[in-house]
């Protein structure tokens, strides 16, 4: 669903459906009163359905990165050994958070565009039997690759008691991730991607094993102390002032997702993603994902040919066609562009992108379009 002005095709923030926009105009209420308690209880219960979990789920007023930081500081102590898997910009971010708080990080790095093999993690666990946690980015937004989280969870559980901490910021709600079914201990995500609301809320699940680790965790924490969040939730409150407007929007967005049915959401996302990849290849582009079976259902990353000026292409798509694409991050800056297809997206949104590219690319001297 594109906005009236732009077809926003970044992998977050994503376009806001009309019911969400309307919910954002709801009047303020007392965040310590019964009305907010009802809102918090309802959204938390619905969020558990999307997470596919019976574990605790908390809604934080923060970005998705806040949830990632929370996952580290609530389960680990300085000096704890952690296996961290990265094949992109956001995997690197998770690594840096763990390092910042003093974890001893054993890094598994893969080429950007490659999937992370569960066998690499299995071998690392065997080499480091005292590892306390494995951290992994499920869907790497910077490369358009979805890693084999199910296989990784199996590899971890069959070889250790390590906690499994998951960055699911650009996957949960769009790509299947049964938190309990796969045995994930802590899963973090954010509001501005699959959940179709503005940035500003973060969501995190916390298992019983994670709570056992919490009792021993010695990393400093205050705002992101999930013990405080749990005590407050039992009273129908949050420990700190919440973004009430985003809670209103979230309540509506969750209703939309659950009414469609999560399985139907996954099917729609997969279909749109397949159409996007097919269309990009038909235009003569090469996907960054080296294994298309692991290509993301929420964002497609595409190599930019040498003959194409990436900044001019992005500018023309926005200024002339009113379509906003995402560029590359870090070492991929200027080398790829990314098409976001998550949230309320339908195939017609991507058809607009493809038609616009067919008009813009020849003007820029790209002959394959």
Where are these regions (language model features)?
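A glycine-/small-polar-enriched, mobile loop at the entrance of the PLP active site in fold-type I
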Residues: 4-61, 65
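Active-site C-terminal subdomain of aminotransferase-like
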Residues: 15-16, 192-278, 282
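Conserved beta-loop-alpha segment that forms the PLP phosphate-binding cup at the N-terminus of a helix
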Residues: 54-83, 87, 91-95
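Active-site phosphate-binding strand-loop segment of PLP-dependent enzymes
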Residues: 116-173
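Conserved active-site segment immediately N-terminal to the catalytic lysine
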Residues: 180-192
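Conserved PLP-binding catalytic core of the aspartate aminotransferase-like
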Residues: 286-320
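PLP-dependent enzyme catalytic core of the Aspartate aminotransferase-like
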Residues: 331, 335-369
């Amino acid at each position: 669903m594109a906005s009236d002005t732009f077809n926003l095709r970044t992998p977050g923030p994503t376009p806001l459906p009309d019911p969400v926009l309307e919910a954002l105009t709801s009047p303020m209420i007392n965040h310590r009163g019964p009305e907010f308690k009802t809102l918090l209880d309802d959204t938390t219960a619905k969020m558990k359905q999307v997470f596919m979990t019976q574990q605790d789920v908390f809604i934080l007023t923060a970005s998705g990165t806040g949830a990632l930081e929370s996952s580290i500081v609530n389960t680990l102590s300085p000096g704890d050994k952690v296996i961290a898997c990265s094949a992109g910009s956001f995997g690197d971010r998770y690594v840096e958070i763990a390092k910042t708080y003093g974890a001893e990080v054993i890094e598994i790095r893969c080429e950007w565009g490659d999937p992370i093999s569960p066998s690499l993690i299995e071998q690392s666990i065997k080499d480091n039997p005292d590892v306390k946690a494995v951290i992994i980015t499920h869907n790497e937004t910077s490369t358009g690759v979805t890693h084999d989280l199910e296989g990784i969870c199996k590899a971890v559980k069959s070889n250790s008691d390590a906690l499994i901490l998951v960055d699911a910021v650009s996957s949960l709600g769009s790509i299947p991730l049964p938190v309990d079914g796969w045995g994930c201990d802590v899963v973090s995500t954010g509001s501005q991607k699959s959940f179709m609301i503005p940035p500003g809320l973060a969501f995190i699940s916390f298992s019983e094993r994670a709570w056992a680790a919490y009792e021993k965790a010695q990393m400093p924490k205050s705002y992101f102390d999930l013990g405080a969040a749990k005590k407050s939730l039992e009273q129908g409150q949050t420990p700190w002032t919440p973004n009430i407007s985003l809670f209103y929007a979230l309540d509506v967005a969750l209703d939309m997702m659950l009414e469609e049915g999560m399985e139907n959401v996954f099917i729609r996302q997969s279909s749109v993603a397949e159409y996007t990849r097919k269309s990009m290849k038909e235009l003569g582009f090469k996907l960054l994902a080296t294994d298309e079976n692991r290509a993301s259902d929420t964002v497609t990353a595409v190599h930019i040919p040498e003959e194409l000026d990436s900044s001019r292409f992005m500018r023309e798509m926005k200024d002339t066609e009113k379509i906003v694409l995402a560029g590359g991050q870090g070492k991929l800056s200027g080398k790829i562009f990314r098409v976001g297809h998550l949230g309320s997206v339908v195939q017609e949104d991507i058809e607009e992108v493809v038609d616009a590219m067919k008009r813009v690319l020849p003007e820029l001297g790209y002959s394959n379009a």
